[in-house]
Amino acid sequence: MEVSLCILLFLLHFNEGIHGVRFTQKPFHQTVTQGNMVRLGCAFEGLSEPEIIWMKDGEKLFSTDQMYITLDPYHWETFHSVKSVQQQDAGKYWCEVEYHGAIISSEPAWITVAGVPHFGVEPEDVAAFAGESFNLTCAASGPPEPVEVLWWLGGEQNGDFTPSPSVLFVKGVNESIKFHCEPRNARGISVSRTGTVHIKARPDSLGRTGHHVSDFNITLTWSPGFTGHSQLSTCTIQLSRGPGEVKLPDVVVEVPPFQHVFEGLRSYSNYSVRVRCDNEVGSSPFSPWVDFHTPQAAPSAAPKNFTFDLSEQQLTLSWATLEQEELRGRLQEELRGRLLAYKLQWNQGGESQDPLLFKENVAHLSGAGRFFNATFQVAACTMAGCGPWSQPVLVMPVSAMQAQTQRGHMWVGLLFGLLVATMVGLLLIVLIRNRGKETQFGSAFAAQGAEVPVSFTAARSFNRQFPELPESTLDSLGINSDLKAKLQDVLIFERLLTLGRMLGKGEFGSVREAFLKSENNSGQKVAVKVLKTDINSSSDIEQCLKEAAYMKDFHHPNVIQLIGVSLHRRAQQRLPIPMVILPFMKHGDLHTFLLMSRLGDEPFTVSQQILIQFMLDIARGMEYLSNKNIIHRDLAARNCMLNENMSVCVADFGLSKKIYSGDYYRQGSVSKLPVKWIALESLADNVYTTQSDVWAFGVTMWEIMTRGQTPYPGVENSEIYEYLIKGERLKQPPDCPADIYEIMHSCWSPVPKCRPSFQHLIDQLELLWAKLNPAPVKEPLLYVNLEEEDGEQANSGTRSSEEPSWGVPWQCAGIEEDEKDWLMVSSGAALAIGGDYRYIIGPSVSAIDEESRHSEDGLSEDIREEEEDVIINV
């Protein structure tokens, strides 16, 4: 009861409030001539500060031409003005006030705009056949009314005024003609837009035709030309396999859109395409033939007739080449691209070995004995990838194969031998029994206490513990005598080395921290480079020791020097593991240092003067190597080390070669190369010179200026050659001065003889270094020890048919035409390029340290871990 009473009192109070507020003035109807001013007014009383809103045709009006005037504290007046009335201002207007959630509205008023007629329908262009009749429409309205319309056709008045809306009937014309209409009322005359009557015709030739090739599909696009004033309905596409070859059936597509996708085309094939379009009159001429080439694909079949020939010196493998041939009237594709190489993989003892690539359909492998009981398979490779593997072939000695074929004839001999053995056994038993009787008879007369006339010592011990392994010497390796003589005076016994944690792993092995004791019990901290454990020939060891032999002759502050060579003897293994002993570099490799300056836990700034000093150190070291006829072939920031004085030393000579004659070295064996640092001619012909080291020096300068970024970001290794041959090069880093970029850019000339020498680079960098102000004396941030107390370190990885354009930066006097041509693949050379190839002698994760602490033979365990094989993605 009390609740109902409260609601009743509230409603009474609300009604009293509603009755207490009201509009005292309302807007009134007005008819205004177009262009004049109009003003509407409202007055409201009952509220102290009411919010009065103007409405037009149900929408709020937001305008600066509104005014509010206070007549008294509870009486307000507002005005809405339009300075220049146009037709769009005509409509219904009123005022609104919100009070206690209710909307109070004034009575509406209409504004009518009077003027010359305004168009509701203007004449539009017309397309018609010649002589075909058609209608033209024109509609206009006031106020004021009435409105009459006059037609003009071809510049002449057609008939008299007719009421709006007006429809003009035209019997037909034979050529294009202009027209317009003129509506009039009491205020004046309006003139419509000028329309055109077009005569329909056949469409013209198409505009631009384009295509996009993706895998085995092509998306064809074209733009229509003049349509003949008639909408295009269909287009006809003709496709043929190259000019003059068989034409495929026509394809008719509805348009728009003006595109079509051809699917399932032949890979690595030439095609030609042309298009025409149709309207209701006829067809356009065909567009010119557009040629395109589908990309390569991985082969669809494996090589057949895979056989081997085993001799005492070598193993020869051969197989049939893949072809494209007609089979039952249908083209059967096997190769599906340009053959790049044949990939040979082999397995021995259940372990996969490094695959090999060969240009021809035959492989000659030396050292036939090491391939006994090995299984081989071969696959063909194009630029798109490798096809399926062939059936495996098991390599067995000829005697074993003959034994297998003759095994059935051995049963007779086996049975005969068994019979003979039984008879001999029975005879021996009889003889032994007789001999035993004679022995027993003789022992009865033996003197007691007599000495035994014969005694012996066991020639073999059955102790289960392995005996201590002897120290290995160079004589046990089977290397050539010159290399052995060169390393004899730097051979260090393994017992003088105490191996510690792993510093990093690379393609050819690992690097460990170690402590080297001398004969007088003093010692020093060193770094030991250890070859992988899967070596199985003296040639593998010889390759590693050649690097040490190179470094033995190096005596330069910017080239790492050799301390010695040691050999790790393995139980039950014929060959030891070579270990190269090098100075321990406190600050690690240059790439990791630069990377930590940007991305470390505590980033630090490296001045431009110090960056140039890094470049100078590397250039001086490389100048020293070039004077000694050494080609490094793997110059990069990751292979440059920082000693305790922050001087850079060129290191890692695993790919180095000494030039004995001429000025170039041709790569002729399987090796894994850092593609993004390799010069253009080296990628094409496997030729390496000092000028190719200059190219790599330019890339290293780019690494230094970008603080350790990876070169060619976004470009895959398999795309590098095509990227460079088009004239593209590394872009100028954001903070790199133009003069420094000009120096590094000069290192990337496509013509090797146009690149600067290392001595010239030193002169240029010294001039730049001299221009800079001396760096501050105190730069503690530069002396950052990347090693932490617990052995952990930060990770170092961040991981056309047109002719190439030879740009101005690489123009050089005397360039021969043949110097601009390179072969994509060198004939007769095994190809093995690819991968990101980042083997860094740098920080390791704590898990490796933990493993080396708890392993009884840390070397044998850790160096078994290998990085994934990196072969060119062909």
Curated annotation (Swiss-Prot):
Ranges for domain Ig-like C2-type: 21-106, 117-198
Enzyme Commission code: 2.7.10.1
Domain (Protein kinase): residue spans on this chain: 497-768
Signal peptide as annotated in the record: 1-20
Sites of Phosphotyrosine modification: 665
Gene Ontology terms: cellular component: plasma membrane; receptor complex
Cross-referenced PROSITE patterns: FN3 (PS50853), IG_LIKE (PS50835), PROTEIN_KINASE_ATP (PS00107), PROTEIN_KINASE_DOM (PS50011), PROTEIN_KINASE_TYR (PS00109)
Disulfide pairings: 42-95, 138-181
Entries under InterPro entries matching the protein: FN3_dom, FN3_sf, Ig-like_dom, Ig-like_dom_sf, Ig-like_fold, Ig_I-set, Ig_sub, Ig_sub2
Presence of keyword Transferase: yes
List of residues binding ATP: 503-511, 529
UniProt topological domain (Extracellular) ranges: 21-411
UniProt subcellular location: Cell membrane
Domain Fibronectin type-III positions: 202-297, 299-403
Membrane topology category: Single-pass type I membrane protein
Superkingdom of the organism of origin: Eukaryota
Glycosylation sites: 135, 174, 217, 270, 305, 373
One Gene Ontology biological process: cell adhesion
Transmembrane segments: 412-432
Ranges facing Cytoplasmic side: 433-874
Keywords tagged on the record: ATP-binding, Cell adhesion, Cell membrane, Disulfide bond, Glycoprotein, Immunoglobulin domain, Kinase, Membrane, Nucleotide-binding, Phosphoprotein, Receptor, Repeat, Signal, Transferase, Transmembrane, Transmembrane helix, Tyrosine-protein kinase
Described purpose of this protein according to its UniProt entry: May be involved in cell adhesion processes, particularly in the central nervous system.
Homology family: Belongs to the protein kinase superfamily. Tyr protein kinase family. AXL/UFO subfamily.
Record's protein name: Tyrosine-protein kinase receptor TYRO3
Source organism per UniProt: Danio rerio (Zebrafish)
